[in-house]
Amino acid sequence: MKAVGAWLLCLLLLGLALQGAASRAHQHSMEIRTPDINPAWYAGRGIRPVGRFGRRRAAPGDGPRPGPRRELACIPLEGGAEPSRALLGRLTAQLVQE
């Protein structure tokens, strides 16, 4: 009977300890906000208060498109030489495959 009472007491103390730890974890992240802050004051001085007043988001069509892209590099040939037909054929075949 004493063993059951000891187990219940340990479980009770463990539950209280976990509950206290969980409630303390949220206190440090809370901010005190005052409603008398004017965002126009910051904007007039060249300061962007991003954190409190929200971020400006880009339109969905403005961002980079997903998918692999291959950037073609333009390398000048020395002496004004023309590229060989074989090289042009390989480059054309690579572009057609993509």
Curated annotation (Swiss-Prot):
GO terms for cellular component: extracellular region. The modification Phenylalanine amide is found at residue 53. The keyword Secreted applies. It is found in: Secreted. More abundantly expressed in the brainstem than the hypothalamus. Residues 58-98 form a propeptide. It comes from the Eukaryota. GO terms for molecular function: neuropeptide hormone activity; prolactin-releasing peptide receptor binding. Residues 1-22 form the signal peptide. Keywords: Amidation, Cleavage on pair of basic residues, Hormone, Secreted, Signal. Disulfide bonds: none annotated. The keyword Electron transport does not apply. One of its GO terms (biological process) is autonomic nervous system development. Its main location: secreted. Stimulates prolactin (PRL) release and regulates the expression of prolactin through its receptor GPR10. May stimulate lactotrophs directly to secrete PRL. This is Prolactin-releasing peptide. The lineage of its organism: Eukaryota, Metazoa, Chordata, Craniata, Vertebrata. The gene is PRLH.
